[in-house]
Regions:
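Short, conserved phosphate/pyrophosphate- and ester-handling motifs at nucleotide-, phospho-/glycolipid
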Residues: 45, 184, 247
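Conserved beta-alpha-beta core of the PfkB/ribokinase-like small-molecule kinase fold
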Residues: 121, 125-201, 218-219
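Conserved N-terminal subdomain of the carbohydrate kinase-like
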Residues: 3-12, 21-32, 47-126, 130, ...
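A short, N-terminal amphipathic alpha-helix
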Residues: 40-51, 204
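Short catalytic helix/loop segments, enriched in acidic residues and glycine
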Residues: 31-43
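Conserved phosphate-binding/catalytic region of the ribokinase-like
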Residues: 2-10, 164, 168, 172, ...
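Active-site metal-binding loops of divalent metal-dependent hydrolases
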Residues: 17-19, 249
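Short beta-strand scaffold segments in enzyme catalytic cores
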Residues: 43, 87-90, 220-223
């Protein structure tokens, strides 16, 4: 049985997750940039004209970086943290490996409660299992708000600072809170390995309306609660482009097209694929790229 249905986003979206400082080394070329779901999805929602809030945690020394997001019209709800989440992404072709040398403190329920009455969609984008405290998922399960969840961070583990596949304890509570879920094809295998069954069975068990599965240049597919399966094709992307954040952009563009613009699944998927391809071609890079000069970033306290 579907827990929530018939949604239209009219008041806005709150994106919940880490704001990160990423060192992306793409095909041998490195750059430092502002990242995380709050950056990529937040800017994508603003490009669709939706009022957008972010709920995040960041070290005080790095808080001025959020001005890049507020300049785009994003409203900031940021709590302090001893550290800022940082990733090192090594990208060669379609292959990516990650390290996470630093992570912020978890996002708490009281932060999320502050935006609940201002929006009609919560976009959850945890980047690691402890990014958002599990109580947030329990809180959102009982709310009338549309909940969109990217599971990427809940199917990751850390081993000696390296990011590897592995499901955590927060996976099931996040699924129980979500109406729309996104994984890539590899992440889906991790979910199914941890919980068993298939996509249709999990959607029924957790009352999920739509499940988006991305597969980079192979396109992907979108499953619906009524048993539908909607394949979509990937849009051609610029060779050698940086794919970091493309999944965040895809999910935000899909959510906006589907629930704000009222497009059907197929058209929303096609629009999201086009937005992701534009992102890989660096459509957002001019706003988010940071200077590589070391003294432009203050050390964390």
């Amino acid at each position: 049985m579907i827990r929530r249905s018939g949604y239209r986003i009219t008041r806005g979206v709150a994106v919940v997750g880490s704001t990160t400082i990423d060192r992306n080394i793409c095909n041998g070329v490195g750059r430092l940039q502002l990242g995380g779901v709050t950056t990529y999805a937040g800017l994508a929602y603003r490009r669709h004209g939706l009022p957008t809030w972010i709920v995040t945690r960041i070290a005080p020394a790095h808080r001025p970086l959020l001005s890049r997001l507020s300049a785009a019209g994003i409203r900031i709800h940021a709590a302090g943290s001893d550290r800022t989440t940082q990733f090192i992404n090594y990208i060669t072709g379609s292959r990516r490996t990650q390290q996470m040398p630093s992570r912020a403190a978890p996002i708490r329920c009281n932060q999320v409660r502050r935006v609940l009455d201002r929006v009609d969609c919560i976009h959850l984008g945890p980047l690691h299992p402890a990014d958002i405290e599990c109580a947030v998922f329990h809180l959102l399960r009982d709310q009338p708000t549309l909940v969109v969840a990217d599971l990427q961070g809940l199917v990751r583990r850390l081993r000696s600072g390296r990011v590897i596949a592995g499901a955590g304890d927060a996976l099931a509570p996040a699924l129980a809170a979500a109406d729309v879920v996104k994984t890539d094809a590899d992440e889906l295998e991790t979910v199914l390995g941890a919980l068993g069954g298939d996509v249709a069975g999990l959607m029924a068990a957790f009352a999920i309306q739509e499940w988006v599965v991305t597969a980079r240049e192979r396109g992907g597919q979108i499953f619906t609660a009524c048993g539908g399966r909607h394949p979509y094709s990937a849009e051609p992307a610029v060779a050698g482009g940086d794919p970091t954040g493309a999944g965040d952009v895809f999910l935000a563009a899909y959510t906006a097209a589907r629930f704000a613009e009222g497009l059907d699944v197929d058209r929303a998927g096609a629009q999201a694929a086009a937005a992701a391809a534009c992102h890989v071609a660096d459509g957002l890079g001019r706003r988010t790229t940071l200077d590589l000069t070391p003294n432009r970033l203050q050390p964390e306290g």
